[in-house]
């Protein structure tokens, strides 16, 4: 076998090949032609359909991807106060280090943007996707939904509220889950929300893939809002994100008003019940 140490192979500590990153993100690299000719995929090492790649910056690893919707989603989730992975537009000078200007311009001319977010895992903390946790529960005769409602109810219900507001039709078992302590294998709470490049759907009856029950995002959110302290006023007062059109923004505001009303109704009913008990 090879005589290698973790220090030598850890991707958290060692440089990444820029040519591979360029190919994964843009599908082309000036210095990677021999391998490019055999590759027919937009990404090489990470899940999902969007073109993406890991790029090392001065303060750590960043995921670069094509998807301007992430910017709008970040702004809305900021206003809602829901924990999430923050996306920013990628710096031009860093893109120019791995790809030629023509291919970067082609993406921008299509109306898209290249965005980035900092890695959320580390050598000390891993992420466990929900679908992997479900497999574990199936082998140990445990109800995964009972576990998550006890382990991290606020983030679980906030996710359902956020997905309805964003019209996110692509929340699934591979893009949400738990943090895990690598020292002892114990699960922590849910990691921040991410992966919103399929948000802002115009469909009204999007099925929820995070609920225990067969229901829509709307139905799941109406139930969930009573268990969260999500604030809707900041979204209702904020300016429309430049990445969204008027129609998409109107739907966001309509859903916020709807859930705010439901939240007030639940709070009123709880106050009435407490008064009656006294």
Residue ranges and their predicted role:
Residues 1-168, 177-278:
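Phosphate/dinucleotide-binding and metal-coordinating scaffold of catalytic cores
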